[in-house]
Amino acid sequence: MVVMAPRTLFLLLSGALTLTETWAGSHSMRYFSAAVSRPGRGEPRFIAMGYVDDTQFVRFDSDSACPRMEPRAPWVEQEGPEYWEEETRNTKAHAQTDRMNLQTLRGYYNQSEASSHTLQWMIGCDLGSDGRLLRGYEQYAYDGKDYLALNEDLRSWTAADTAAQISKRKCEAANVAEQRRAYLEGTCVEWLHRYLENGKEMLQRADPPKTHVTHHPVFDYEATLRCWALGFYPAEIILTWQRDGEDQTQDVELVETRPAGDGTFQKWAAVVVPSGEEQRYTCHVQHEGLPEPLMLRWKQSSLPTIPIMGIVAGLVVLAAVVTGAAVAAVLWRKKSSD
């Protein structure tokens, strides 16, 4: 595996990258990339994205008519032309490096040139509530599996298998961990602070969820209660069901938090209950935008099943659109909070 030079890591001008949120809580900044080979159809596609907290602020796609790092949030549009030229130049260099890495890894694993493969990468830093570095991280995945990760001490690496051991030794010989540590402890933190200040109206807000419970008969003897949380930011939220005050884990379905397409998020949790016992069940919602946790019960005046099913269908379509736009660059976010 080719070792990346520090300047190919999206290092912005003389700044840094980090995450988002209010100073009342933690914030993070992460960059994701994915290089996907496509035998017989030209060079591998490369996509990269940057996030502050839950907000995407930059994006690059090598398949664009004019590939450049582009803004995805209004508060980053104020950066000058030198910023965007530097971002684009570094991202293109990163793309070329990862294309070479794909070839190298295919050789490590003795794989055919006819098959498609994916190399994913993530780097980022978290700030604590005091605005200081909480943790930094860098991770690689190959074909959806862990490959190489920078350890929490920012001085050593963990290799997932024998092939990754080769890359680990190369990184150690080139003192890559020292370069990453300097970036994560300095540049990343500095730029995260800058982004949080420039985008504070958007990034340091807390929009509470709009909540309700719907009822969906399954059979004559049971029904599904679905607890909805809509239009909230940031994305972190907790939905739980209780029966007579005791947490329920069986027969509970919980979907992943989904973007709503307007900068907010959506989520629901459902539980199957015996017909006639609906009032014994309560949904509990915790979110930083709420002054205190909410407790909800189903009311027979709640919206009927048909409109809710329309919302479900809309969420499914929305999730598919968002996933298609993000491609593989956001498929792998494992260990980011380890």
Swiss-Prot record:
It comes from the Eukaryota. Expressed in adult eye. Expressed in immune cell subsets including monocytes, myeloid and plasmacytoid dendritic cells and regulatory T cells (Tr1)(at protein level). Secreted by follicular dendritic cell and follicular helper T cells. One of its GO terms (molecular function) is signaling receptor binding. Keywords: Cell membrane, Cell projection, Disulfide bond, Endoplasmic reticulum, Endosome, Glycoprotein, Immunity, Membrane, MHC I, Secreted, Signal, Transmembrane, Transmembrane helix. Residues 25-114 are annotated as: Alpha-1. The VL9 peptide/epitope (VMAPRTLFL) derived from the signal sequence is loaded onto HLA-E and enables HLA-E expression at the plasma membrane. Confers strong recognition by KLRD1-KLRC1 or KLRD1-KLRC2 receptors on NK cells. Belongs to the MHC class I family. Forms a heterotrimer with B2M and a self-peptide (peptide-bound HLA-G-B2M). HLA-G-B2M complex interacts with components of the antigen processing machinery TAPBP and TAP1-TAP2 complex; this interaction is required for loading of high affinity peptides and heterotrimer translocation to the cell surface. Interacts with CALCR; this interaction is required for appropriate folding. Interacts with COPB1; this interaction mediates the endoplasmic reticulum (ER) retrieval of HLA-G-B2M complexes that bind low affinity peptides. This is HLA class I histocompatibility antigen, alpha chain G. It comes from Homo sapiens. The gene is HLA-G.
